């Protein structure tokens, strides 16, 4: 049982650090966006986000912000997935729905 818990703990650490290994603090500086878009190209209801698209979210994009209880999808910036819509802050996409998350104390 102790070995299983240790393996699960190590797997969790690996998952958390994977993003840092791929998208380190200087990734966007070392790999600048090759196809940036202008802020003026975003049309309502989309909003301009400077760091949203491409691998590690190094490029700007026009994004629609979703309200509470809207359908959503989680994505991986490490592999370059770029959703055109994301949950509006401070909402989080949980089980495919934008949900208000109470901060832990």
From Swiss-Prot:
Highest taxon, organism lineage: Eukaryota
Signal sequence interval, chain numbering: 1-19
GO molecular function term, any single one: serine-type endopeptidase inhibitor activity
Keyword Disulfide bond annotated: yes
UniProt key word Electron transport: no
Cystine residue pairs: 23-56, 28-58, 33-59, 42-62, 72-93, 87-98
Alphabetized UniProt keyword annotations: Disulfide bond, Protease inhibitor, Serine protease inhibitor, Signal
Its job: Inhibits proteases from the fungi A.oryzae and R.oryzae, trypsin and chymotrypsin. Does not inhibit protease from the bacterium B.licheniformis or papain.
Protein name: Fungal protease inhibitor-1
Gene name in the database record: fpi-1
